[in-house]
């Protein structure tokens, strides 16, 4: 049966079943038993603060108690009202967890499964129901005293947070011999200390995705992920597979490195998080933990076979029932003999589920929320929110609520987009700092006098995590004895969520028939912990490092005015100065508004900044790093690069190691030798020893690669990622200063247009965030390429060199073994030597995907080798009404005749076949491209729109790159778009797409996306809108000489078509024309197709941007043969007289409610209304009040759309919201009924056949009528009857 989550008020009375007073004996803040509420099954909540400290104190401590950030509030959960809120927040989170199958399964296991009643001190034949890690006392007040009346055996108790409110923790019980039942198979109760309304915030600045496209890239965690992460720990504890806390990766503590101080990354945390971070734990260690758990489970099974008694003896009657519960929990097998055993396959299945499926990383995907992609992410100031308010946080969507338009790009979690997310009081925060001390030399002094220390405090969390080399396991490199009995352990592959959890029927759980025995004896009271304090550390530096440079870019608080400076020292010493690394920006900002031209000045400043941050320097397109971001050096002074002069030149000389503040040199530990021997001098055993050695040799190579990967992930990538985070902060500091300067100048501005330009000024400032997102994509690409280059060029060769030396020694030993036993091996010597020689002939290849199942890492590596953009050798774009090549190869582009360039999106260019429209574009590619080798595999893609076409028109070439009858071309012949490869006049091959030339209006004039891929040794393929249309084999085209000139021109192909006159002018529009020096695959093409659609902007029927204040014919996708008309004031759709013509019916104009009047594009989520003019009278479309009638019956919640005379009053009846609904086959939108504030989506616009009222009479026959379906309209969301198209009247 489904899981039921109980509802409570904190004031509800104790009922001795679901509400009890519990005494855990663990909370040192509790002077008496605490009120507890059963959420479901074995899961309980105590809405009180929790501490294990011997002397607990909830006040902000005088010194830091953790390397992590801390938030303290002694008043939190101090009142019954606070406790009631906390209780209801936990209940709501459990309901949200329970809304997905994986969450339901998680709750089910925690609420029904039980720890083993006992531990390794318990006699093997006994169930002990009174163990201290399992039993919690139930107490009742009798007079002035609390009396124990029983006990319960929960699996999880959730309490309020510990002293540090933002540091959730899951704890369990330690046994007297310093072992944990939670780690030894038995399982144990977990106490989770958490605060659901305080959330950590992170940056997704290192991700090349669109989340930051319209705002800053900072987001808060969904509170269910915080809770579910801790529930993962609780489940590991419950199943007895918890990883010991001493299994960690520590941060480097040396003053040589800028690394987080005293941070220990626990393996247990990595397991609970999952995802890419799991690769920080070597597979050998993961296998060790799994095998250890298997041994413990075998011990548990052995105990179950021996159980004969229970403590207390009154529970002997429950022995059989508890055995069955434990057999089910551990997935043990009961043999025909009755013996309980462990089936290894069932154990592996269970272990994989617990460690690879139930992870924070997977939860984020399944609940569709934004989350950190790796465990080690940049942390920002925490936020709080009222998650009990369904308008802020609901069970289905969390913060990303569709009705508030916060579901797009996870805006509900975005700190700059959701006002409900409030930063906590900074006065209550506490940080561990590193104090940098820079002692400069006074060059003016004759004796080079050292100046006083220039101090800078940097938060510990702002430093990168650099793993200590001593924690990267090296035991795999120890000397190893090889004989005929040596075994090789192979590590299992990762498993997927789909394979395990989501295939289960989690709704059929059965009744929660849990036992809660009453026990009279007292549990042991365990001692509390002592509070540990940390001291800030001081680190001397010999130059102003990146942290000083970032500090110099921050705008000081309460500064009335400021100027930009190029001197970091000046900015550090003067609060009215801000350092910038863009000289022209400094000049323009500091000049201020000249001659009252405020808007021109602001535009110039923003354009200068955005131009600078989008700069890339290309040294060599064939190199590993495709483009350098030149301003990273002066922005962060990485490795004192500013002192070295030009950063790009320094990078070219030094390479990627210039970016690493620490650990620029990589060394592999000494590889222990193989000691080869055979105990018995027998032929088969010697041969087996040789085989085992060859297998161990392969394992040694793979182990070395794995060690290298662990080192790269924990010590190198973290440093590279830190540069991305720092650059994100730097760009935002620069943009923040620009915004502040614009505000200051606007405040002083007194022009008559001040109010009119206010919205333009705001749009200018907002555009800075958009450009920062674009710049971060460039920076992240550069950083990723550098990190991968370091792996392949700095690390991998050294590992292979060491392994080759190891191979030479091992091979010599094996040959010696064969020679020294040549008599025993008679007849086999030459064969064995050949086997050894062949085995050592080649190195073991490094396939990175053999060492990780990390999809994010795979994407990075694939980008390194096969990045789509990197393979562009031509990118023809319209930039500021000029056609240019933006690929980096700088092809020459010229225009002849009348080529019309569109100055607004989609920035296309138009070609015509005759008259004034005739023109051509000529592209001459760079001489440095070696065409014949480049085009062994190549692809071409472009968007094209062609006006109406008929089959008897002549054929036309539209794009031509043929010279001396050799090359390629694209044309239109009859109803086909044709791509042709031509070797000579007699040898060519073509592939085509049948273009719709039907007589129906829908069959022409639309934008569509064409991709042709060519593999000269394989196939030619054509894709339309990302879909594969046709594949043909490339045959006998081995000598194509490709031209460097590409001409875009409509030229008639002789002897084609029936019409020979030039009077029928053909027009077409082209945009985003690319050539790639590779064969794109289907995934590449889909990425390209989706990235070029700009899906947030609503499209008209042809695929152009839908515009405000422009006339359109409105059509329904299900009834394209109908046009919009009015019968009295009721809108109806009549049958067209000519299916080939959209120009029939009434025209509508889309009007905006509010927003930027300079941007005429209609965007998804816009609130708008529709104007219509009929016989010179103005109307609005509006929703009528009467419901529709069908078959003489009222149709519930369906209302007609009619006409209302236009007035100045804009009321809710005429207001709608629009969302794009584009797909492979057409461009359309969905229209929803909304209100003036856009806060309420009450219905969806559809179409259907109804009768409607006119005056007091009903029409006798039915009409096709547009309607609004209110109430439950979810079923219509997928219906094409709700898809509306807008055909421009002018086209």
Curated annotation (Swiss-Prot):
CDD domains the UniProt entry points to: Toxin_R_bind_C_BoNTC
Annotated binding of a ganglioside GD1b (d18:1(4E)), by residue: 1126-1129, 1146
Mutagenesis or variant effect for residue 1193 to A: No effect on receptor-binding domain (RBD) binding to eukaryotic gangliosides
Spans traversing the lipid bilayer: none
Record's cofactor remark: Binds 2 zinc ions per subunit. The catalytic Zn(2+) is bound by LC, the other Zn(2+) must bind to another region.
Region annotation Ganglioside-binding loop: where it falls in the sequence: 1269-1283
Residues spanned by motif Host ganglioside-binding motif: 1256-1258
Record keywords, A-Z: Disulfide bond, Hydrolase, Lipid-binding, Metal-binding, Metalloprotease, Neurotoxin, Pharmaceutical, Protease, Secreted, Toxin, Virulence, Zinc
GO biological process, one term: symbiont-mediated suppression of host neurotransmitter secretion
SUPFAM superfamilies: Clostridium neurotoxins, 'coiled-coil' domain (SSF58091), Concanavalin A-like lectins/glucanases (SSF49899), Metalloproteases ('zincins'), catalytic domain (SSF55486), STI-like (SSF50386)
Record: residues binding Zn(2+): 229, 233, 269
Effect annotated for changing residue 1203 to F: Receptor-binding domain (RBD) has decreased binding to neurons. Whole toxin has greatly decreased toxicity. Decreased binding to mixed gangliosides
UniProt-annotated stretches for the region C-terminus of receptor binding domain (C-RBD): 1094-1291
Reaction(s) this enzyme catalyzes, per UniProt: Limited hydrolysis of proteins of the neuroexocytosis apparatus, synaptobrevins, SNAP25 or syntaxin. No detected action on small molecule substrates
Gene Ontology MF annotations: ganglioside binding; metalloendopeptidase activity; protein transmembrane transporter activity; toxin activity; zinc ion binding
Location of the region described as Belt in the Swiss-Prot/TrEMBL record: 490-541
Residues that coordinate or bind a ganglioside GD1a (d18:1(4E)): 1119, 1247-1250, 1281
Additional information: There are seven antigenically distinct forms of botulinum neurotoxin: Types A, B, C, D, E, F, and G; new subtypes are quite frequent. Types C and D can undergo domain swapping to create hybrid types.
Subunit: Heterodimer; disulfide-linked heterodimer of a light chain (LC) and a heavy chain (HC). The LC has the proteolytic/pharmacological activity. The N- and C-terminal of the HC mediate channel formation and toxin binding, respectively. Can also be purified in complex with a non-toxic component that is larger than the HC. The stoichiometry of the whole complex has been modeled as one BoNT/C, one NTNHA, three HA-70, six HA-33 and three HA-17.
The name this protein goes by in its record: Botulinum neurotoxin type C
Taxonomic lineage from the root: Viruses, Duplodnaviria, Heunggongvirae, Uroviricota, Caudoviricetes
């Amino acid at each position: 049966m489904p899981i039921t989550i109980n509802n409570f008020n904190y004031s509800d009375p104790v009922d001795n079943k679901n509400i009890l007073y519990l005494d855990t004996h663990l909370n040192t803040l509790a002077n008496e038993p605490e009120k507890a509420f059963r959420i479901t099954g074995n899961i309980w909540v105590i809405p009180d603060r929790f501490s294990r400290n011997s002397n607990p104190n909830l006040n902000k401590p005088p010194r830091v108690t953790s390397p992590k950030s801390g938030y303290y509030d002694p008043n939190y959960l101090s009142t019954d009202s606070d406790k009631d809120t906390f209780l209801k927040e936990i209940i709501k989170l459990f309901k949200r967890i329970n809304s997905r199958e994986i969450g339901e399964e998680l709750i089910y296991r925690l609420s029904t499964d039980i720890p083993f009643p006992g531990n390794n001190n318990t006699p093997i034949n006994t169930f002990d129901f009174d163990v201290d890690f399992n039993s919690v006392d139930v107490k009742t007040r009798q007079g002035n005293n609390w009396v124990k009346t029983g006990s319960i055996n929960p699996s999880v108790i959730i309490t309020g947070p510990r002293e540090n409110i933002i540091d959730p923790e899951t704890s369990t019980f330690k046994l007297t011999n310093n072992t944990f039942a939670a780690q030894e198979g038995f399982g144990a109760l977990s106490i989770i200390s958490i605060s659901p309304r305080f959330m950590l915030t992170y940056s997704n600045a290192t991700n090349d995705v669109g989340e930051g496209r319209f705002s800053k890239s900072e987001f808060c965690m969904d509170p269910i992920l915080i809770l579910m992460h801790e529930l993962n720990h609780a489940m590991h504890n419950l199943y007895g597979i918890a990883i010991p806390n001493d299994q960690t990766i520590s941060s480097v503590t040396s003053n040589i490195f800028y690394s987080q101080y005293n941070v220990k990354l626990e393996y247990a945390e990595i397991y609970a998080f999952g995802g890419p971070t799991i690769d920080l734990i070597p597979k050998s260690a993961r296998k060790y933990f799994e095998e250890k758990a298997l041994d413990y489970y075998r011990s548990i099974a052995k105990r179950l076979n021996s159980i004969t008694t229970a403590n207390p003896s009154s529970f002997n009657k429950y022995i059989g029932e508890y055995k069955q519960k434990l057999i089910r929990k551990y997935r043990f097998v009961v043999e025909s003999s009755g013996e309980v055993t462990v089936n290894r396959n069932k154990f592996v299945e269970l272990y994989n589920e617990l460690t690879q499926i139930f992870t924070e990383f997977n939860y984020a995907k399944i609940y569709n929320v934004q989350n950190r992609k790796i465990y080690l992410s940049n942390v920002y100031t925490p936020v709080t929110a009222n998650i009990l308010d369904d308008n802020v946080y609901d069970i289905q969507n969390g913060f990303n609520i569709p009705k508030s338009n916060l579901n797009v790009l996870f805006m509900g979690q975005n700190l700059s987009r959701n006002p409900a997310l409030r930063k906590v009081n900074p006065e209550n925060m506490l940080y561990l700092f590193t104090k940098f001390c820079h002692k400069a030399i006074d060059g003016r002094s004759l004796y080079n006098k050292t100046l006083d220390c220039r101090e800078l405090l940097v938060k510990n969390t702002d430093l990168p995590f650099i793993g200590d080399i001593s924690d990267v396991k090296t035991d795999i490199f120890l000397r190893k004895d090889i004989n005929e009995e040596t075994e090789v352990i192979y590590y299992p592959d990762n498993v997927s969520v789909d394979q395990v959890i989501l295939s289960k029927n989690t709704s059929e759980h059965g009744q929660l028939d849990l036992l809660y025995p009453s026990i009279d004896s007292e549990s042991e009271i365990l001692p509390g912990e002592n509070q540990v304090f940390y001291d800030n550390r001081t680190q001397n530096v010999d130059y102003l490092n990146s942290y000083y440079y970032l500090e110099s870019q921050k705008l000081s608080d309460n500064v009335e005015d400021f100027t930009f400076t190029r001197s970091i020292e000046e900015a550090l010493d003067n609060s009215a100065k801000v350092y910038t690394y863009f000289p022209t920006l400094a000049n323009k900002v500091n000049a201020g508004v000249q001659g009252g031209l405020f808007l021109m000045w602001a535009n110039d400043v923003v354009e200068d900044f955005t131009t600078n941050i989008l700069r890339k320097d290309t040294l060599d397109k064939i190199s590993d790093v495709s483009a350098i971001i030149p301003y990273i050096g002066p922005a962060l002074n990485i490795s004192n690069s500013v002192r070295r002069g030009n950063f790009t030149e320094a990078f070219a000389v030094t390479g990627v190691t210039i970016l690493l503040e620490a650990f620029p040199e990589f060394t592999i530990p000494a590889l222990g030798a193989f000691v080869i021997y055979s105990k018995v001098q027998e032929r088969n055993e010697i041969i087996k020893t040789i085989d085992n050695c060859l297998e161990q040799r392969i394992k040694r190579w793979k182990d070395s690669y794995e060690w290298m990967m662990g080192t790269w992930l924990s010590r190198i990538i973290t440093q590279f990622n830190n540069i991305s985070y720092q650059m994100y902060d730097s760009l935002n500091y620069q943009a923040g200063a620009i915004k502040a300067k614009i505000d200051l100048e606007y405040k002083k501005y007194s022009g008559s247009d001040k109010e009119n330009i206010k919205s333009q000024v705001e749009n200018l400032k907002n555009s800075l965030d958009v450009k920062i997102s674009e710049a971060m994509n460039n920076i992240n690409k550069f950083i990723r390429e550098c990190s991968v280059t370091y792996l392949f060029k700095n690390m991998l060769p050294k590992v292979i060199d060491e392994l080759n030396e190891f191979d030479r020694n091992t091979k010599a030993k094996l040959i010696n073994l064969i020679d020294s036993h040549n008599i025993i091996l008679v007849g086999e010597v030459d064969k064995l030597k050949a086997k050894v020689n062949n085995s050592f002939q080649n190195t073991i290849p490094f396939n990175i995907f053999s060492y990780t199942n990390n999809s994010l890492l795979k994407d990075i590596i694939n980008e390194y080798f096969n990045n789509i953009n990197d393979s562009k050798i031509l990118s023809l774009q319209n930039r500021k009404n000029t056609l240019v090549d933006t690929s980096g190869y700088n092809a020459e582009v010229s225009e002849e005749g009348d080529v019309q360039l569109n100055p607004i999106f989609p920035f296309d260019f138009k070609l015509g076949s005759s008259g004034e429209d005739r023109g051509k574009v000529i592209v001459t590619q760079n001489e440095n491209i070696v065409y014949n080798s480049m085009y062994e595999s190549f692809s071409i893609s472009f968007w094209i729109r062609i006006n109406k076409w008929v089959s008897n028109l002549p054929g036309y070439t539209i794009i031509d790159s043929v010279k001396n009858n050799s090359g390629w071309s694209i044309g239109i012949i009859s109803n086909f778009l044709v791509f042709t490869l031509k070797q000579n006049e007699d040898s060519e091959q073509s592939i085509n797409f049948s273009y719709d030339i039907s007589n129906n209006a829908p069959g022409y004039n639309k934008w569509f996306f064409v991709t042709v891929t060519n593999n000269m040794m394989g196939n030619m393929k054509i894709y339309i809108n990302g879909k594969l249309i046709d594949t043909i084999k490339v045959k006998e085209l081995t000598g194509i000489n490709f031209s460097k000139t590409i001409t875009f021109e409509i030229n008639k192909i002789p002897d084609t078509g029936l019409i020979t006159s030039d009077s029928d002018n053909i027009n077409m529009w082209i945009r985003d024309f690319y050539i790639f020096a590779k064969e794109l695959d289907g995934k590449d093409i889909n990425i390209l197709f989706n990235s070029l659609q700009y899906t947030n902007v609503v499209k008209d029927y042809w695929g152009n941007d839908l515009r405000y204040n422009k006339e359109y014919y409105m059509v329904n996708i299900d009834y394209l043969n109908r046009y919009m008309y009015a019968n009295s004031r009721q809108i109806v759709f009549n049958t067209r007289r000519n299916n080939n013509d959209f120009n029939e019916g009434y025209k509508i104009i889309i009007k905006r409610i509010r927003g930027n009047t300079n941007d005429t594009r209609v965007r998804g989520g816009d609130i708008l209304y529709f104007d219509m003019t009929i016989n010179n009278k103005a109307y609005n479309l509006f929703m009528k009040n009467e419901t529709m009638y069908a078959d003489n019956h009222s149709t519930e919640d369906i209302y007609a759309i009619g006409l209302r005379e236009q007035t100045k009053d804009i009321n809710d009846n005429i207001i709608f919201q629009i969302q794009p609904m584009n797909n492979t086959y057409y461009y359309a939108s969905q229209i929803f009924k909304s209100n003036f504030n856009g806060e309420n989506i009450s219905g969806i616009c559809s179409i259907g056949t109804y009768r409607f009222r006119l005056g007091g009479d009903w029409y006798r026959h039915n009409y096709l009528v547009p309607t609004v379906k209110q109430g439950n309209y979810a079923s219509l969301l997928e219906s094409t009857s709700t898809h509306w198209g807008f055909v421009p009247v002018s086209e």
